[in-house]
């Protein structure tokens, strides 16, 4: 730390968890306090700006590329910083929370990159926040091998050369970390806590390993938010004596407003940017959030009916690939969330074919890599990208100059021919309750109906219920979506779960709370910006 650093550290307000003192050292807490002092006020201003922009979208019912940044888009001369060697080849990336078992499995998976997730696939209990930091630090020092006490299975890292490169995803700007306050008494943003602790403890070690501190930035809504991250990176590197430009960040384009500012986001982060990623559920969730009162033309069908080949989704991914390659950045495709069944090979065969077709399409479209949720899908995705890339690390030379996407095409959401169905509504209720219940118990990555679901799934599920009710949607069976119908479905799901699980297991869960929270955010007249905010109030630990 520099001589000008404040002497007052951030204050821990949580009961101690194992090995907490290794993470929350005095110097680390001082670093967090300084991040908070310098950058939380700007974070707060940008969150307020989100609300103002939402109000503007509500008034106009549309979005457009920004006229004030047209010069950035028109300037052909600028590029993002070259990718470091460890991020040249990103053809398959695996995602998952940073618990010890996932850490070993992901690093050993054969994927080129592991997205170590502190965001949507991690419920932010204090124990999860601290243990995730410890898992990364232990992995970088090769002291993470362990034997599971329940299963007796041993987990051990392969040689360094065979391990995936870690790209860590902190929480989004909206989430607080209630267990840490600054000297001013203000609660620290979870994003600054996750980034700050990871960077403080591991940046130097990663450089010694020939890699670096690499991050995924979630839920950005504007280039001003990217500018804030860039300023944080510059400050953090200077404070710890890390060379400027060492950090690399990949931005998830998972909000509709960010889709209109992809070039500007890369420009703001150009010293540190390494790519953009195309999300799906959070992107659709963002469309509903921003255009929820824009009329029937913005009512989406069942979420599973909206594929990446829907015209408005294709416009988004085509523009992302073109933007990335024009500026020298990697374009990373979306998630394959299938979880293989150990009992039903037919389910696996059909799902693997679907994953293969999806990854074939992404590789053919010019993406440089893609995401999977399970190690068994790594070879499937790898085959798709190997067929296109061969021994090249990426295909950034495919500039896709033939692509031309208009502002209107990005929000032509009425293009899918599908319509809301009774099965889709029931699925939204069932998945919403099941996911929220697990999240409230501290689990953020949950296998539901053969898919690995995270908070984005719960967000799109509850948002669709809210949208269909408020739009007066009539399902394909002639039934109108009403609060009474949703309550009936939710009560039926609780009854089915009680019967399936048995009284003792059901009572040990948090099913009634999950049911109540889903109904609260799905049925309230006022749309909740994020499900995870009221859920965090109920999260214990």
UniProtKB/Swiss-Prot annotation:
Localization in the cell: Cytoplasm
One Pfam family, short name: MS_TIM-barrel
Write down the EC number: 2.3.3.9
Q: Which CDD domains match?
A: malate_synt_A
- TM segments? none
This one is known as Malate synthase
Keywords per UniProt = Cytoplasm, Glyoxylate bypass, Transferase, Tricarboxylic acid cycle
Family of this protein = Belongs to the malate synthase family.
Entry-linked InterPro entries: Malate_synth_C_sf, Malate_synth_sf, Malate_synthA, Malate_synthase_CS, Malate_synthase_TIM, MS_C, MS_N, MS_N_TIM-barrel_dom
Q: Which residues form the active site?
A: 169, 454
Q: What class of enzyme is it?
A: transferase
Q: Does the keyword Lipid biosynthesis apply?
A: no
Organism (species)? Streptomyces clavuligerus
Give any single GO term for biological process: glyoxylate cycle
Q: Which reaction does it catalyse?
A: glyoxylate + acetyl-CoA + H2O = (S)-malate + CoA + H(+)
Entry's Gene Ontology cellular component terms: cytoplasm
| MF terms (GO), sorted A to Z | malate synthase activity
Keyword Oxidoreductase (UniProt)? no
Q: Which residues form a coiled coil?
A: none
Q: In which pathway does it act?
A: Carbohydrate metabolism; glyoxylate cycle; (S)-malate from isocitrate: step 2/2
